[in-house]
Amino acid sequence: MIEINVYYKKWYSTIKKPKIFVKNVIKSSLINLNIYEYKPIISIVLANNILLQKLNYEYRNKNKPTNVLSFPYDKLNKKCNLGEIFLSLDTLIQESIDLNIPIEHHTCHMLIHGLLHILDYNHEEPLMQYIMESIEIKLLDKLGIRNPYVSRETIYP
């Protein structure tokens, strides 16, 4: 089950039908990762810089906003609670402008990035970064979105 909370109402004027948009991205990713049949519980909060900065400081001791934060809970198994993903629309908009890409594409990328984190992927070491980025690229391609790493350095919170 995918639970979506629109904490920051500006999401409605930026992404058309944000709850459906997010649900489709996560569902597609779970299907392509061959784990949709597990029916995991995933909570997604569509937020802003104020909330993400607060959470980033509280949990990572970084007093600044970020694009995505993930909080993994259970390991993958039937109907487990995989975790929560928080997105900041403010940061995503600014990064989309800086990267000259559609906000929808960048939002898809950061949703997938957050999903992979709650599935225990990370980018702390070069090999893990390569694996994680490779999966992101494949999942984005399934959504018709080009490789975000072609002409830029990676963006990580």
Swiss-Prot record:
This protein's UniProt keywords: Cytoplasm, Endonuclease, Hydrolase, Metal-binding, Nuclease, Ribosome biogenesis, rRNA processing, Zinc
Cofactor-binding details, from the entry: Binds 1 zinc ion.
GO biological process, one term: rRNA processing
Chief location bin: cytoplasm
Highest taxon of the lineage: Bacteria
GO MF assignments: metalloendopeptidase activity; RNA endonuclease activity; zinc ion binding
Gene3D superfamilies: Metalloproteases ('zincins'), catalytic domain
Subcellular location: Cytoplasm
E.C. designation(s): 3.1.-.-
List of residues binding Zn(2+): H113, H117, H123
GO CC, alphabetical: cytoplasm
PANTHER family the UniProt entry points to: ENDORIBONUCLEASE YBEY, CHLOROPLASTIC
HAMAP family referenced in this protein's UniProt entry, alphabetically: Endoribonucl_YbeY
Protein family according to the UniProt entry: Belongs to the endoribonuclease YbeY family.
Function: Single strand-specific metallo-endoribonuclease involved in late-stage 70S ribosome quality control and in maturation of the 3' terminus of the 16S rRNA.
Name the UniProt record assigns to this protein: Endoribonuclease YbeY
